[in-house]
């Protein structure tokens, strides 16, 4: 998937993300391959690595070293599915991400659930205090978008903007 992603975005000059789990990050082969492909395609400043929040990180030192290495190369880090797991704030303290992507399970109810709105607002406020950009997942209608817009998110994603595009795994490698 790394090769296909890099090949697909090689000449597009846009940011793109790949998801990595703790298991992926702890696999030396995967990390060496990622570093090799980063050098080959020179996409350091376009890549955002999304670390899956809903998976337990067993070795924070290993992940922190990985994050520091990636950031030193210009790669940005996001915590994906923020709000879906148990260690959210610890992840922020330990990994110092560039982005937090708030999980759709919180966002999808923001327009008709006051608790969801207040929780989201609190996450946005603390993220801004820490200079972390915040992205809303699962924006599926105008009402949800209006609430997210009110909170001044940095980025948005969901069916309201576009249905998923062609799966990159189907991309013709040429």
What positions do the PLM features span?
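Alpha-helical scaffolding segments of alpha/beta enzyme cores, especially the outer helices
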Residues: 7, 29-36, 62-72, 118-125, ...
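Alpha-helix termination/capping residues and helix-transition junctions
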Residues: 10-11, 40-44, 72, 94, ...
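Catalytic core of bacterial c-di-GMP phosphodiesterases, primarily the EAL and HD-GYP domains
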Residues: 1-62, 138
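EAL-family c-di-GMP phosphodiesterase catalytic domain
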Residues: 21-24, 50-58, 75-174
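Short, flexible, glycine/charge-rich loop motifs used to bind or transfer phosphoryl groups or to couple energy/partner
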Residues: 37-40, 68, 89-91
């Amino acid at each position: 998937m790394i090769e296909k992603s890099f090949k697909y975005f090689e000449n597009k000059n846009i940011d793109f993300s790949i998801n990595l789990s703790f298991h992926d990050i702890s696999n030396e082969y995967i990390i060496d391959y990622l570093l090799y492909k980063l050098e080959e395609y020179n996409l350091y400043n376009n890549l955002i690595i999304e670390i899956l929040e809903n998976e337990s990180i067993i070795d924070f030192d290993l992940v922190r070293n990985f994050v520091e290495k990636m950031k030193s190369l210009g790669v940005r880090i996001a915590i994906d599915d923020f709000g879906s797991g148990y260690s959210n704030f610890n992840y922020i303290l330990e990994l110092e991400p560039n982005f937090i992507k708030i999980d759709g399970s919180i966002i999808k109810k923001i327009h008709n659930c006051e608790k969801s709105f207040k929780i989201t607002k609190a996450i946005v406020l603390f993220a801004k205090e820490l200079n972390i950009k915040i992205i809303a997942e699962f924006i599926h209608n105008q009402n949800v978008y209006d609430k997210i817009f009110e909170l001044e998110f940095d980025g948005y994603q969901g069916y309201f903007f576009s249905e998923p595009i062609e799966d990159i795994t189907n991309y013709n490698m040429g």
